[in-house]
Amino acid sequence: TVATSFQSSFNGVKETNNNNDRRVIGVEYTTPPIDVAYYFGISVNVPVLKLTRQTYVDEKPVTHYETYINPIVPVDEKTDFSGSMYAKLEQAGYPITHVKEKITATLMSTKQKELFQIAKKNEAIMNRTRMGSSNDLPIEYTYSQYVANGYELVIDLK
């Protein structure tokens, strides 16, 4: 395994849509995966809000996001998440002030090829795990998958 890590600081987090076609696929309460429950400091039996979104290019999904939101945040399944999730969290009183991310790349599994409507062999996917907190309080945990062919990740820390 080859790994690279870096640490830096930034002034908040915000999403820019850049005219992307980002769609909310679902908003529901569910039991969290164990790593999400551990990050939030809750039992895996405590339901959390799960937000599923996808970004489309030419009517095909190129990014899949599954975000879990800490139950302390006053949002629910009726909240409109069609805009920026970070703006919504800030409006709820929990601006994201710190982010930790893990980024890996692998070949697509059969399930991922179905999700992204890919028929080719040996297609790459980038997996990204992001944990966001507000003043050291864990707020969101997101699993993201990106079709890696031609994908560029730009991190602009200020």
Language model segments and positions:
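C-terminal regulatory/effector modules of DNA-binding transcriptional regulators
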Residues: I72, T79-D80, A87-K158
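A short beta-strand signature
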Residues: V44-D58, I125-G132
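Short, solvent-exposed beta-strand/turn "edge" segments of beta-rich domains on protein surfaces
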Residues: Y39-N45, Y56, Q117-K121
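A short, well-structured catalytic beta-strand-centered motif of the EAL phosphodiesterase domain
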Residues: G41, E66-I69, Y143-Y146
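HTH-adjacent hinge/linker in prokaryotic transcriptional regulators
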Residues: T1-N45, E66, P74-K100, T104, ...
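A short glycine-rich, His/Asp/Glu-containing loop-to-beta-strand
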Residues: R22-R23, K50-L51, Y56-V57, P61-E66, ...
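Bacterial carbohydrate/catabolite-sensing allosteric modules
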Residues: N19, K60, L137
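Broad gene-expression machinery/nucleic-acid interaction feature
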Residues: V24, V48-K50, H64, I125-N127, ...
